[in-house]
Amino acid sequence: MFLELKAQATSILKEAIRKAGFEVEDSELQFETSPHADLASRAAFRLAGIHRQNPKDLASRIVSAVEIPEGSFIGKVSAAGPYINFFAGKHYLNGTVNAVLKEKEKFGCGAPKDRILLEHTSANPNGPLHVGHIRNSIIGDTLARILRRAGYDVEVQYYVNDMGRQIAVVSWACERFELDLSRKSDSAIADVYIKANVELDKNPGYIKEIDALMEKVEAGDVRTIEHFDKAVSLAVAGIKETLLRLNVAHDKFVSESTFLKSGAVHDIVERIKATGRTKTDKGALVVDLSDYGFEKTLVIQRSNGTSLYTTRDLAYHEWKAGQADRIIDVFGADHKLISGQLRATLNAIGVKEPEVVIFEFVSLPEGSMSTRRGQFISADDLFDRVTGAAFEQVETRRPETSYEFKKQVAEAVGLGAVRYDIVRVSPEKSTVFNWKEALDFEKQGAPYIQYSHARACSILEKAKEEAAWNPDKEIDPSLLVEDSEIDLIKKMAMFDSVIDLGARELKPHVLAIYARELADAFNQFYRFVPVIAAEDENVRAARLALVDCARVVLANSLDTLGIIAPESM
């Protein structure tokens, strides 16, 4: 709704500027939100600079030329010094309520757009995911959900490293040490992987065996490939379980080895050579990207002729470029250099480059993590801690409920807290995940937003019992005139613009912030305005419809954040 409000304001302002004797492009209208209006334009500043006139006088001149069409979302336009302020009218407010009631879960969805292939998580299958990995998963999954709601056709992929050095170590470890298959499969893999690294540190001579395994895989040795596949399958099966619990889904798992077997890796190396950028450095084949601003060369082939992860990743990206209109990668900050080199190399051979979302790292108060050293808290362990603490809270708040209810709510609240607390921070900022704070209702995180949704559900259930409320009965939104009612309607109307912003800038945290603000607006409304207790029947019906609208938009926001919206807590 807000996007349409802005579009109408743009049209009205552009026409008024034309009538005032000036010309301006849409991009020069410079709209912004303001505490003094629903939209404010700085166009008078722009025009004053060009025509050497007083911006305050120009703003008044433009406003005097404004004509608001019948039925417009704009109710009033005024000048405030050099600013041109736009105020939403009754058609906008009433239209928002009616749109939410009609569209329900479709409210905030954009028109169909391009096809996007988005890759995220893609952690090495050498053990369980830890909290560092799941920031990638949460950012990527939330972005996919935002993009889908914005109208994009999104396919999400996980790129499986099934043949790199770490996987060679995993395969070697599985042959050397016994797997404890009574444990979750990715944890069993981590156990032997950690043991193998201890062994390799003590006896560096074994590294030759690792190198030999990698050469055999590249040469297509069937038995070695089978051992690699078995180890990788076990790890990936466990990783999928973890992601499923976090409400993260991938449409496709793509194996790195696919591109070696198909000949795509060989082909892309030959095409890179043809650019004249390659040279030999200590027997290895490297790419000179100095004209792209990279002093460090990119190694694409080892001295023994085997390919690297990066080489295979280049082939993967070329394949992806043919699958979609846009390619998006979600990488940690440690991939900043390599992702830049990858983009430059693809550009050099005429392949569509990916858009890259780089995120800084998340840590726990306990410190840093490393799968190789065995110094990590798995995502599974973290989830168990958080949901366990959430269960205790539910038991305290709702002792009369069943064990199944408590367990279900604890899982929704605990995992919601993890997702929200991680995604609420802008990707480029590092963060420390403190699960106790994430579960604190006073911190206004996921539990607070979920509770606001449950509260709306509870009000509506009570209304059906006590006030004979009929949700299908037509209501009059124009009866919603209190400040807190109007504030809530305007906040709901912002949903489509928040989705649009998150999709355009690939910033999922804007939706997390919005969801909290929406919960605030709903709770303020309910605090100051009687709903079921409203004396006038028509006003009561309108306010209950507004509660229903808030429930819908809170649910849509939580769903797009990948968080369960409980009906009762």
From Swiss-Prot:
Keywords (alphabetical) are: Aminoacyl-tRNA synthetase, ATP-binding, Cytoplasm, Ligase, Nucleotide-binding, Protein biosynthesis
Tell me, what is one Gene Ontology molecular-function annotation carried by this entry?
A: arginine-tRNA ligase activity
Question: What EC number(s) does its UniProt record assign?
Answer: 6.1.1.19
Q: Which GO terms describe its biological process?
A: arginyl-tRNA aminoacylation
Q: Where in the cell is it found?
A: Cytoplasm
Asked if the keyword Glycoprotein belongs to this entry, the reply reads no
**CDD domains hit by this protein:** Anticodon_Ia_Arg, ArgRS_core
The similarity annotation says: Belongs to the class-I aminoacyl-tRNA synthetase family.
- Record-linked PROSITE patterns: AA_TRNA_LIGASE_I (PS00178)
Question: Gene Ontology terms, cellular component aspect?
Answer: cytoplasm
Reactions this protein catalyses: tRNA(Arg) + L-arginine + ATP = L-arginyl-tRNA(Arg) + AMP + diphosphate
**Top-level EC class:** ligase
Instruction: Tell me the protein's name.
Output: Arginine--tRNA ligase
Primary location group: cytoplasm
Which residue ranges does the UniProt annotation give for the motif 'HIGH' region? Answer: 123-133
